[in-house]
Design a protein with these regions (language model features):
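Short beta-strand segments
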Residues: 6-7, 57-58, 99-104, 153-154, ...
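Short catalytic helix/loop segments, enriched in acidic residues and glycine
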Residues: 19-44
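Glycine-rich nucleotide/cofactor/substrate-binding loop typically near the N-terminus or early
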Residues: 37-93
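N-terminal glycine-rich phosphate/adenylate-binding segment common to multiple enzyme folds
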Residues: 78-121
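Active-site glycine-rich loop that binds ribose-phosphate moieties when present
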Residues: 83-84, 120-146, 154-158
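C-terminal accessory domains and tails appended to enzymatic cores
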Residues: 192-277
Length: 277
């Protein structure tokens, strides 16, 4: 049995502030240790539950945050950027039985600690077929096309509530309770590691591949915080303006949908001006 862990950082133990997840800051150095602890707890739990292989895919920012030297020696880690499926890279090869979303967070326009969808502030909302979408929701639809179930989700309490919509049977672990976008009641790393390890062990039993789900077409709508970003996004083929700050596109598969979304976010990031956004 092989488990894939998609590891993001905003939903990690102790993380509440932008500097906590911004590579190179003193706070990031401190928080990446707690992030690594969360991931390692999931790794150990999956091995406890009978997994033969566990692959961790780094999914935050530069995708070079986890401390490999502190992970269980049995694990493998995919680190670095420019991956075909980004946050869920590795699911497409046909050998993954279940996936865990560790350190996940709520989506743009939602309540939740450091809530966003791909871009920190420039995107104010994303909708998938009319439903407001977090990264978890988008990624769950991608992995469903490969017959892989989401078996574990960790993050703040809002991220766990969000996961009820896209992975109702998955085990959930709230490592902190949302107070505001930049505040939370946090549990200690020792406590969250124990909770995550226990949940991952139980979640291993949910790692049973199912027939691929072909739920298309998928219409993705994106709202930005500035008009010129919507204009920039229309450079991507198939992306059309639907309002002053909104665009939308339709894809037959989520594989195509997520890759188009990546293209949109890449171009929009380059279009942001330092002073006016």
């Amino acid at each position: 049995m092989k488990i894939l862990i998609s590891a993001d950082m905003e939903g990690a133990t102790g993380v509440t502030w932008p500097a906590d997840v911004l590579p190179g800051t003193p706070q990031w150095e401190r928080c990446r240790s707690m992030f690594t602890s969360d991931v390692n707890a999931a790794v150990e739990g999956f091995f406890d539950g009978g997994a033969d292989r566990v692959l961790v895919n780094e999914a935050h920012w530069t995708m070079r945050n986890l401390l490999l030297e502190r992970l269980d020696e049995r694990v493998e880690m995919l680190t670095g950027r420019h991956k075909a499926l980004s946050m869920v890279e590795g699911v497409q090869h046909g050998d993954v039985d279940g996936i865990a979303f560790v350190g996940y967070h709520a989506g743009a326009g939602m309540e939740g600690v450091l809530a966003h969808t791909y871009l920190a502030n420039q995107i104010t909302g994303v909708w998938l077929n009319g439903v407001r979408a977090s990264e978890g929701l988008l990624n769950a639809h991608v992995v469903a096309e490969y017959g892989v179930p989401v078996v574990l989700v960790t993050g703040d309490d809002i991220a766990c509530e969000d996961a009820l919509g896209y992975a109702p049977e998955a085990r959930k672990v709230a490592v902190k309770d949302h107070v505001s976008r930049y505040a939370a009641v946090c549990r200690t790393p020792a406590r969250t590691a124990a909770d995550i390890r226990a949940a991952a062990k139980k979640a291993t039993g949910l790692a049973v591949r199912h027939p691929p789900v072909r739920g298309g077409p998928f219409t993705v709508a994106v709202e930005f915080d500035a008009e010129h970003l919507a204009s920039a996004a229309t450079v991507v083929p198939g992306v059309a303006r639907t309002g002053e700050r909104k665009v939308a596109y339709t894809s037959s598969t989520m594989y195509e949908g997520i890759r188009t979304f990546k293209a949109v976010t890449t171009i929009v990031s380059a279009a942001v001006e330092e002073q006016y956004g």
